[in-house]
């Protein structure tokens, strides 16, 4: 993983190439910017893992995020009435992570996100399956994603749906906390440099 890639994905402001800084000298080096990220990790490790999965498609972060999400799912299902297979927890986690990392919806498989398809006469027309290249998250699309891991009936999925919504909101909350912690740390660092 390149440092520049990581920093660009999180939109860390700190490199200023203006004439007031001596031409091409940055205010914060890449190492200093990574230190800012490191200082914020303790605020919301799950949020950071989610950001790594969302922005960098990091496989190691995905594995750790799945473990953390499974723990949260098990906690949420402690007083669940009835039985459920272990695959249900995995399906809940996979669906929740997918929704939390793709909040605008999944990329449409028919138009590959372009929102335009070519028909058999080579005419370009608007894709009927999506809105602006994304398939929005609805209860049906969540069910389809859930059924990839655990094929169940729709009525059975509706029992898992409440837990799945709680998992998504937990993941999005952690992501927001990580971003806010990073912003606060960057503001503190910039105030220190000004003073």
Question: Where are the regions that the model predicts?
Answer:
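Short, flexible, mixed-charge glycine/proline-rich loop motifs
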Residues: 93-107, 115-122
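Cys/His-rich microdomains that often coordinate metals
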Residues: 115, 131-136
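Feature marking protein-protein/ligand interface regions
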Residues: 2, 23, 102, 174, ...
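Long, charge-rich boundary regions
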Residues: 138-195
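Charged/polar, solvent-exposed surface patches and flexible loops
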Residues: 5-8, 51, 75, 91-98, ...
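Short cysteine-rich clusters marking metal-coordination/redox-active sites
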Residues: 108-111, 127-130
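Short Cys/His-rich "knuckle" micro-motifs
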Residues: 118-123, 137-141
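N-terminal alpha-helical interaction blocks
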Residues: 1-94
């Amino acid at each position: 993983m390149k440092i520049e890639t990581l920093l660009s994905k999180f939109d860390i402001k700190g490199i200023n190439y203006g004439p007031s800084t001596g031409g091409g000298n940055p205010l914060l080096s890449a190492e200093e910017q990574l230190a800012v990220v490191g200082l914020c990790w303790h605020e919301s490790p799950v949020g950071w893992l989610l950001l790594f999965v969302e922005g960098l498609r990091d496989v190691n972060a995905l594995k750790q995020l799945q473990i953390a999400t499974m723990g949260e799912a098990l906690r949420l299902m402690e007083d669940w009435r009835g039985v459920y297979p272990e695959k249900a927890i995995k399906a809940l986690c996979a669906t929740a992570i997918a929704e939390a990392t793709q909040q605008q919806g999944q990329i449409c498989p028919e138009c590959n996100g372009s929102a335009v398809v070519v028909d058999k006469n080579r005419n370009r027309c608007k894709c009927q399956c999506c809105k602006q290249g994304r398939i929005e998250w609805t209860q049906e699309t969540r069910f389809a994603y859930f059924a990839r891991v655990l094929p169940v009936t729709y009525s059975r999925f509706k029992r898992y749906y409440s837990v799945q919504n709680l998992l998504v909101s937990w993941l999005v909350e952690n992501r927001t906390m990580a971003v806010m912690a990073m912003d606060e740390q960057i503001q503190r660092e910039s105030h220190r440099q000004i003073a």
